[in-house]
Amino acid sequence: MELLKEYNPYLEYRDGELFIEGVSLKELAQTFGTPLYVYSSNFIKERFEAYRKAFPDALICYAVKANFNPHLVKLLGELGAGADIVSGGELYLAKKAGIPPERIVYAGVGKTEKELTDAVDSEILMFNVESRQELDVLNEIAGKLGKKARIAIRVNPDVDPKTHPYIATGMQKSKFGVDIREAQKEYEYASKLENLEIVGIHCHIGSQILDISPYREAVEKVVSLYESLTQKGFDIKYLDIGGGLGIKYKPEDKEPAPQDLADLLKDLLENVKAKIILEPGRSIMGNAGILITQVQFLKDKGSKHFIIVDAGMNDLIRPSIYNAYHHIIPVETKERKKVVADIVGPICETGDFLALDREIEEVQRGEYLAVLSAGAYGFAMSSHYNMRPRAAEVLVENGSVKLIRKRENYDYIVEPSLDI
């Protein structure tokens, strides 16, 4: 029970049945079907408030990529969050969810001409520019629109964030940002482009960071650049230090709090007059979400035991591509014996699994499992692979339930291909 509270304080067993915010997960599965994503509203609110308390003067821009459900983005926007976006679709969504453009920052190495045009036209707070060529293209677009685009340059501090290599973004070999040693040249170049207004510096070193010491190394370099640019007369209004705080996936993981990060950086930032921007995503949304899946079949092949469920890599791809661990527990616990099994989905690939060689309480066909820490990069990375409709999503708060995404059907998948 105590372990569950470390994942989400609103998660508990009552008489052997799993509840979240007073709502039975079994009843949710029976009402809405499976696979089903379930989110805890109070958890999301508390995580956002933890950032606001730790960084009271900062702009907290939620990383929309983590989970783009409009209801969840709207919830955060109403709390005062801005949006960290990386695509035209995320710009559209953030505005649709009520987040004003003056609280939107736009990163990403491959912004298209249309995406840049729409964002300039929307007059967003800041473009986090990733290359000199992007500076040129953005300047040209802003000129055609008769506007000035506010920019920061994303600098790459060459810091190892000690995370999975696929989500380490602050090392020299990664595709992101400009070499921090070359940054002053890029700022001087940008200052000569008449349709750009330099307002900030941006840095983001990676995701799922549990050891926060690399943040200090990165921010030291960024603050040094800030001081140098300020001395040269640049008016740096915003220091965007990105996101990336990790969450508890494995039972033994120790999750850093926003206050831990604030304490680590306090002395570095105390003389910085620029407004700080942070871009949390996973650390707000990750443990707010659970994926419920139903056991379809049990299968033994010699000494190998398989639990085959209806959620696959199309619903939650993190285990397949990152070899990521998600804690999985029965929705109904009956103090049965433990078995060691591969928990696998229905997709026609050997790489379709939620867990391998996992010790878990013995379950039967038709029962439900809860996959924890599924609120970030879960539905957001889902697909229609094997022609499977994507899951429904519900939001729970203090015993109430709201359907926030309908389950897709086959017509939804094929309709864009018909009558062409």
Curated annotation (Swiss-Prot):
Q: What is its EC number?
A: 4.1.1.20
Record-listed substrate binding positions? R282, R318, Y322, E349, Y377
* Chain positions with N6-(pyridoxal phosphate)lysine modification: K65
- From its record, what is one biological process in GO terms? lysine biosynthetic process via diaminopimelate
Q: Which key words are in the record?
A: Amino-acid biosynthesis, Decarboxylase, Lyase, Lysine biosynthesis, Pyridoxal phosphate
Against Pfam families, the record matches this protein to:
Orn_Arg_deC_N, Orn_DAP_Arg_deC
Q: Which GO terms describe its molecular function?
A: diaminopimelate decarboxylase activity; pyridoxal phosphate binding
SUPFAM superfamilies per the UniProt record, alphabetical: Alanine racemase C-terminal domain-like, PLP-binding barrel
Pathway(s) per entry: Amino-acid biosynthesis; L-lysine biosynthesis via DAP pathway; L-lysine from DL-2,6-diaminopimelate: step 1/1
What cofactor does its activity depend on? pyridoxal 5'-phosphate
Residues forming the catalytic site? C348 (proton donor)
Listed under catalytic activity are: meso-2,6-diaminopimelate + H(+) = L-lysine + CO2
Q: Where does pyridoxal 5'-phosphate bind?
A: G244, E279, P280, G281, R282, Y377
| Quaternary structure and partners | Homodimer.
Known function: Specifically catalyzes the decarboxylation of meso-diaminopimelate (meso-DAP) to L-lysine.
UniProt family annotation? Belongs to the Orn/Lys/Arg decarboxylase class-II family. LysA subfamily.
Q: What is the protein named?
A: Diaminopimelate decarboxylase
Q: Which organism is it from?
A: Aquifex aeolicus (strain VF5)
